[in-house]
């Protein structure tokens, strides 16, 4: 059987992430920007710019960490197409999350040995509204595998072409 067109060439891929110094009220602004041009013969090619500004207000103590966060995910596409997509597509999706952890420790004597017992419960709430993304090509996006850590990811997709809707408490 004939091989498919193969993977996209990235010409180039630039990524920038900035943690802005703390503002008053302990707000933590952050911005991530990625720009990539995807090229593959015989199919849709084009550029993508992904902007992810966010603002969080961490509450961090020795016994707890609570981080509410608001983000905006804006992705813009500039396409050279074989007919399936418009020349220009975009998507803007708000993201809200609340990550809460408690840290409890106690000394424990067991069989003559002193140990430190630690309990770290965590609750994570994520809200992302449903957004139709059928008009956007998939250049480099796939689903993450299911792991314990993936329960706390902001997006169930790896890559910038899809943002998974969510209204869940983990």
Mark where each language-model region is.
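Outer-membrane beta-barrel proteins and related beta-barrel translocases across Gram-negative bacteria
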Residues: 1-170
């Amino acid at each position: 059987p004939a091989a498919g067109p193969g993977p996209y060439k990235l010409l180039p891929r630039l990524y920038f992430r900035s943690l802005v110094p703390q503002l008053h009220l302990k707000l933590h602004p952050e911005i991530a920007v990625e720009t990539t041009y995807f090229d593959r013969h015989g199919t849709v090619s084009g550029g993508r710019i992904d902007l992810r500004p966010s603002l969080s207000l961490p509450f961090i103590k020795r016994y707890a960490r609570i981080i509410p966060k608001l983000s905006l995910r804006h992705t813009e596409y500039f396409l050279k197409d074989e007919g399936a997509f418009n020349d220009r597509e975009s998507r803007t999706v708000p993201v809200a999350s609340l990550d809460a952890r408690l840290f409890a420790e106690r000394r424990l004597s067991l069989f003559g040995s002193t140990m430190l017992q630690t309990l770290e419960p965590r609750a994570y709430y994520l809200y992302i509204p449903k957004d139709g993304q059928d008009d956007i090509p998939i250049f480099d996006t796939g689903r993450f595998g299911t792991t314990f850590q993936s329960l706390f990811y902001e997006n169930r997709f790896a890559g910038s072409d899809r943002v998974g809707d969510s209204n869940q408490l983990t």
